[in-house]
Amino acid sequence: MEIKEMVTSEMPRERLLSHGAKSLSNTELLAILINTGRKGFLSIDISNELLKSASNLNELKKSSINDLIQVKGIGLQKAITLKAAFELGERMGRRAENNRIKITQPSDVADYMIPTMKDLTQEHFVILLLNSKNVVIKESCVFKGTLNSSIVHPREIFSIAVRENANAIIAVHNHPSGDVTPSQEDIITTMRLKESGLILGIDLLDHIIIGDNRFTSLVEAGYFDEND
């Protein structure tokens, strides 16, 4: 029995096409790499056995060709395919790590975000998620349109930060007019996020407003001072 005998909607390839790769389990992703099963086993069964052979994915990627072919259903060609996929993933991970930006001052944020935000014709509200070393681990656009403090919910923003295990966040949004003067709504939104961050233990480090090759840091402008 091979994977083609499964109900079409349940096949890993079909699920990937319908719902995206992120919706698939580790077992299903490996089954796609394994491609075909062997007599009496679906590729999904072989994938399960493969995962059982190592304590976790990190250990599995360290497996040698000889280790992999010890798993029933994994021949030399499948082992080579898996090893190549593991190495490619490792290289991509190293490259992503090397490309991450460390934030040490507001101008670092501006240099990072101005190229993508300065020409936008609509306001975009983005959060940068940082680890404990102030390295950007992810950016997420949470809102598009005219900024309104009643629309930008701290709950939505910090749920993303919690999900990504962020240590701190920086808010960034653009002014299509090019004027980087903070509006009253900008200030209110900043204060709400700052207060929520203090409660949750995820600091809002700054709010940067991007204009036409210019920026304003609300920290540098004094809005984060304890007396404000």
From Swiss-Prot:
Positions contributing to Zn(2+) binding: H173, H175, D186
MPN domain span: 102-224
Domain of life the protein comes from: Bacteria
Gene3D superfamilies for this protein: Cytidine Deaminase, domain 2
A Pfam family hit: RadC
Protein name as annotated: UPF0758 protein SAB1521c
Keyword Membrane attached: no
